[in-house]
Amino acid sequence: MSRNVDKANSVLVRFQEQQAESAGGYKDYSRYQRPRNVSKVKSIKEANEWKRQVSKEIKQKSTRIYDPSLNEMQIAELNDELNNLFKEWKRWQWHIDHTLMEKKTKRKRLEDSHVLMNSGKLINGKRYFGRALELPEVKEWLKQSQRQNDGGSINTKCIPKDRNDFYYHGKVTAALTEFEANWTSILKAHYNVPVNEDEEEMSRQTQEIHVPTLADMEHWLVQRRKKKLMDELNL
């Protein structure tokens, strides 16, 4: 009995909707199946209504995907549905902007901004929404991407010990400075490169400077103390 009542009510509702649509143009788009081919819709008003239905469904499912009671399979299925809905929404948007709308406008509807804000994260050519970012394949892909990024940096631990010195890293040492000072003028003369007078003078002065050794410093300190002691004794 109840099934017959429900069937009669549904028939009555459909009849009333048809009358309302024919009389005043009212149509409950949520009760109809969306067209698969968006190009068949020639009315911009109808296209906007279908796009609004897609936006509502995206909003509902993007909220549901955060449900902690969902298992991994349900999350993956829901994420695939959201990917398909997002593609459908883009088809409607393109059809409206490039086919039906005579003059393009920058004004965005409220549901459009919601869809764009909740468009998920694009990973390896696919969008992932909400808890779908916690799926094993997503974590594995992010780990591989991180390893590839880390591989581009220099790891000094992999450098051989005999190469891990000042010369390998390009640090300036006294020996390197002396070598450059001695050979700069020679190499420039060999390759016919004009030598700057300031550089030549600096190179000559560098060659003339005697860098004291540790033994020289010890000898100098002994002589200084000896002279100071002799001055105190008036010798």
Swiss-Prot record:
It is found in: Cytoplasm; Nucleus. InterPro entries: Helix_hairpin_bin_sf, Isy1, Isy1_sf. Keywords: Cytoplasm, mRNA processing, mRNA splicing, Nucleus, Spliceosome. SUPFAM superfamilies: ISY1 domain-like. Pfam families: Isy1. It comes from the Eukaryota. Its main location: cytoplasm. Involved in pre-mRNA splicing and cell cycle control. As a component of the NTC complex (or PRP19-associated complex), associates to the spliceosome to mediate conformational rearrangement or to stabilize the structure of the spliceosome after U4 snRNA dissociation, which leads to spliceosome maturation. The cell cycle arrest of SYF2 defective cells may be due to the inefficient splicing of TUB1. Also involved in DNA repair. Belongs to the ISY1 family. Belongs to the NTC complex (or PRP19-associated complex), composed of at least CEF1, CLF1, ISY1, NTC20, SNT309, SYF1, SYF2, and PRP19. This is Pre-mRNA-splicing factor ISY1. It comes from Saccharomyces cerevisiae (strain ATCC 204508 / S288c). The gene is ISY1.
